[in-house]
């Protein structure tokens, strides 16, 4: 054999030595491709893309902030409504309880007007009852309960309950002329309407007075002549 001829072992070594060189160069291919792609992107296009992303994020932020503000406002309104409803319920319970006490006050007042105790023992008992009545009235005052002043006031169905209507020379028409049962209110809310008598006005004049006035007219004319 000549000196230039290669043995099979030498050929195998040459092939095996070439393979690693191919493997070492292969990882550089993706990196080169990425660099080429980056170099191919226009900076103006990239800036426009970033601005679009920023605009989308701002819009999402505004939407979420608006939703948050709306939820916060709804919760605040709910809290206020709950507080108002609880306050109204508490007032209704208090007014209902106070309304139940008013007939007891009426009984004390009727007893005070009608009874005329005689003797020291009866008078002492009467004073004891009146002491309880005064305490009860004081408690009602502390709770804001007040009596209605109705006589001489114009009839108001929101405050008064008309039981009778009669002619009156003292009060004009539709004016309360007499209080039959006390009315009470608390903080602008009616606990009990006042039962009243309402005036119908002075009524028609006496028919007998008209001829007398007519007869007096000629005499007055004659005197003037």
Swiss-Prot record:
Q: Which UniProt keywords apply?
A: Chaperone, Cytoplasm, Stress response
Which InterPro entries does UniProt cross-reference here?
GrpE, GrpE_coiled_coil, GrpE_head
Q: Where is the composition biased (Polar residues)?
A: 1-15
Please explain the role this protein plays, according to its UniProt record. Answer: Participates actively in the response to hyperosmotic and heat shock by preventing the aggregation of stress-denatured proteins, in association with DnaK and GrpE. It is the nucleotide exchange factor for DnaK and may function as a thermosensor. Unfolded proteins bind initially to DnaJ; upon interaction with the DnaJ-bound protein, DnaK hydrolyzes its bound ATP, resulting in the formation of a stable complex. GrpE releases ADP from DnaK; ATP binding to DnaK triggers the release of the substrate protein, thus completing the reaction cycle.
Question: What's the gene?
Answer: grpE
Molecular function GO terms recorded: adenyl-nucleotide exchange factor activity; protein homodimerization activity; protein-folding chaperone binding; unfolded protein binding
One Gene Ontology biological process: protein folding
PROSITE patterns to which the protein is assigned, alphabetical: GRPE
Q: How does it assemble?
A: Homodimer.
Q: Where is this region: Disordered?
A: 1-48, 198-225
The record ties this protein, via NCBIfam families, to: PRK14140.1 (NF010738), PRK14143.1 (NF010741)
Q: What is this protein called?
A: Protein GrpE
Q: Which family does it belong to?
A: Belongs to the GrpE family.
Q: Where in the cell is it found?
A: Cytoplasm
Q: Which GO terms describe its cellular component?
A: cytoplasm
Here the segments flagged for biased composition (Low complexity) are 201-225
Principal place where this protein is found?
cytoplasm
